[in-house]
Amino acid sequence: MKKIEGGICAVKGVTANGIKLGKMGITVIRAEGPAAGVFTKNKVTAAPVVLSKGVIETQHQLSAIIANSGNANAFTGDDGFLDAMEMASALSESLDLEPDTVAVASTGVIGRRLDVSWIREHLPEVLEGLGSSPECSLAAAKAIMTTDKALKEVAVELDCGVRIGAIAKGSGMIEPNMGTMLCFAYTDALVPADVLDAALRIAVDKTFNMVVVDGDTSTNDMVLFTSTCKSGIKPCMECLDEFEDALIYLFTDLAKKMARDGEGATKLIEARVTGAKTYEDARLAVKAIVRSPLVKSAIFGKDPNWGRVVAAAGYSGAELEQERLSLSFSAGGETVELVKSGEISRVSDLALLNKIMANEEIIITLDFGMGKESATAWGCDLTYDYVRINAEYTT
């Protein structure tokens, strides 16, 4: 497997484009084939999520996606669902597609009626620029950004020649479950919808569902995975393993980009729990660590306050014994051990510890010393800017 340029447009059979005008944006991706999706588990579910989930569950295929930024079309009642349907109809009419094979996604402010007339007005401009160049993938990724500071796209080519590419957005209201983000992934492998669905659920659970920026789960999250089947390559059993691994690699890359791009963030936190009795124990603890406002604040302040880490693990619901815990902080290939088998370690190199805490990417490793299961999660520090951004979001 190798990383390649081009984002989703590196995949045969995918054309895309997007425009961004102020806070409003439109993305269109044209690619036809079997498809799978996972969606937010927030019980306050946005209209486009309801529509797109219905498309996936009934058709198991997609012909296109239309997405807008600037308005979530959430908590908008029947009018909101009609607006989502109108978005699908506008695209299907323009491209001569069946409307029940078009997925719709929205991101932005909750509780405000979507201006569909604005979308209809600017849709022709988007469609005129549909293409398969790397620039088209970038334009599509840019148009769905809200408070994101960085574009999020990635593509790989497997040894068998199959390609997978994805774009995503997300920087705030992020604790996927599924959620808080949008991701559109494509492959040219000759695979049916059930294979896509199985690979997607495994990959999402290990990656996007392990990201915490602020602990809030959005109303609009979705990940859609479509195969154009254009490579003509049907992966063998061995290649299917590589296919799943490649999807996990792609989503891990995007998940880390989301965490690093968290609203106001200055540092990426990677937390690892090892030596747990069960995977669920490791998962509970590691997500509690990256979710903890006290841990996140300490990382922002370059404060090696490791007590907050063990406290978060302790209240997470995971089974652990404090006399078995070992804890270290790492960055740039260097590590400082802070706790060993329940005993506080004497840190002789304070300069190294300070150097680690000043790094932009910090790894926290907590070993339970009880088993062989492990889990990894990603988050970011909690800064003054996070409060400012969200205090001023609608005002």
UniProtKB/Swiss-Prot annotation:
**Intracellular or extracellular location(s):** Cytoplasm
Q: Which keywords does this chain's UniProt record carry?
A: Acyltransferase, Amino-acid biosynthesis, Arginine biosynthesis, Autocatalytic cleavage, Cytoplasm, Transferase
Enzyme Commission numbers on file? 2.3.1.35
Under catalytic activity, the entry for this protein gives:
N(2)-acetyl-L-ornithine + L-glutamate = N-acetyl-L-glutamate + L-ornithine
- Positions contributing to substrate binding: T146, K169, T180, E263, N390, T395
Pathway involvement?
Amino-acid biosynthesis; L-arginine biosynthesis; L-ornithine and N-acetyl-L-glutamate from L-glutamate and N(2)-acetyl-L-ornithine (cyclic): step 1/1
Extract one GO cellular component term from the record.
Answer: cytoplasm
Any idea what this protein is called? Answer: Glutamate N-acetyltransferase
- Organism per entry: Methanosarcina acetivorans (strain ATCC 35395 / DSM 2834 / JCM 12185 / C2A)
Give the source lineage, highest ranks first. Answer: Archaea, Methanobacteriati, Methanobacteriota, Stenosarchaea group, Methanomicrobia
Q: Which gene encodes it?
A: argJ
